[in-house]
Each structure stands twice: as structure tokens, then as C-alpha cells.
Regions:
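Active-site flanking residues adjacent to catalytic metal/cofactor-binding acidic residues
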Residues: 1, 19-20, 130, 160
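Extended active-site neighborhood of metal-dependent phosphoesterases/phosphodiesterases
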Residues: 2-106, 148, 173
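His/acidic metal-ligating clusters that form di-metal
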Residues: 80-173
Length: 178
């Protein structure tokens, strides 16, 4: 018997994945130019165009996700989106690998405009899933993420880029950490 069957897991409902630094492999024109522009200012008015161009690098990842989970509810699984688990937890999938080169660990990028469009439903627990740790994100992006986390009462930020178990608090404001 397969482990998923023994645990009574449904791959369509119980599997949550986010893109990592090895997933953005589809060729994108001017990739380095877009990454440089975003590194200069990831929250600039022109940033959405660069993020959109870089999201094209995740076409193979998106195909993989849709092959594995045919009725995946999001058209573009590599974009920031929310999936609700069994009407109990909102998992916020964030693509923090959008500007990853596999070498540099700091000042990682994420399209915070996409995050701002996400509105978790109901009184469910909200958990962010990301590849890169919060501390590895660009400071300007961290600030925008903190605003969103504060508004939507995020309970946890789970990541796995560094392949180690670690617990770190994220100070949302002077009165609250997650």
C-alpha cells in the first residue's frame, strides 16, 4: 500500500508546493536585465513588468504542477495565490525564487503586488509557504510583506531553501511576532 493511501492523503487536496531556485529554468529574454532592475528597486512602478517577464521562467514548473495535480485551482501555480486546505487553513503560496540564481541567498525577490491582491477568506488560519526564508528577502519586500501579514493575521511563514530545521520570529510590529 502506498504511503499516501495509508495516511489517507489526497494529492489534489493535501499537497502544497512552491517553486524553488531550480524551478525557474524556462528561457526568458533579458532575464538578467529584469533581475537587475528588480534588485535596484523591487517595488518600483515598473516592477510588475519585470516580475511578469520573469514568471515566464516557471512554465516548466507550472506544467509539472498541473501534470501532478490536474485540477489545480490556480491558472499559474508559480504566481502568488491562496489554496484553502480542507476549509481550515489558508496556505498562501509565494514565489520567492523569481530572481534566484542558485548562488546568492540574500535580497531575494517576490512580487508583493500579487501578494497584495490575495485576500484570505474567513476566520481560517493563514500560513505563508515560500522557498526562501523571510530574512533572505530584500528588506523593502520584507516591509511590504509584514504589512500584509499584520492585516491578515498570518500565523506562520514556512520555507525550505536552506534545508534545515530552524525557528525564527518575524517581528510584525512592536506587539506581535510570528
Amino acid at each position: 500500500m502506498r504511503l499516501t493511501e495509508q495516511l489517507e492523503l489526497d494529492i489534489n487536496k493535501d499537497l502544497f508546493i512552491v517553486p524553488g531556485n531550480h524551478d525557474g529554468v524556462t528561457k526568458v529574454d533579458c532575464k538578467n536585465t529584469h533581475i537587475k532592475a528588480l534588485n535596484d528597486n523591487p517595488i518600483d512602478d515598473e516592477a510588475p513588468e519585470s516580475f511578469q517577464a520573469l514568471e515566464g521562467a516557471f512554465r516548466d514548473y507550472e506544467k509539472f504542477v498541473k501534470d501532478m495535480i490536474p485540477d489545480y485551482p490556480e491558472l499559474h501555480p508559480a504566481k502568488t495565490h491562496i489554496r484553502c486546505w480542507r476549509e481550515r487553513i489558508n496556505f498562501v503560496h509565494c514565489n520567492t525564487a523569481i530572481g534566484a540564481d542558485g548562488k546568492k541567498k540574500d535580497r531575494q525577490l517576490m512580487n508583493v503586488d500579487e501578494l497584495a491582491k490575495c485576500s484570505p477568506s474567513g476566520e481560517k488560519t493563514n500560513i505563508i509557504l515560500a522557498h526562501n526564508s523571510f530574512e533572505d528577502m530584500d528588506a523593502r519586500i520584507q516591509n511590504r510583506m509584514k504589512d500584509w501579514m499584520r492585516i491578515y493575521h498570518v500565523a506562520a511563514y514556512l520555507c525550505g531553501d536552506r534545508h534545515r530545521r530552524e525557528l525564527t520570529s518575524i517581528e510584525i510590529d512592536r506587539k506581535k511576532n510570528i
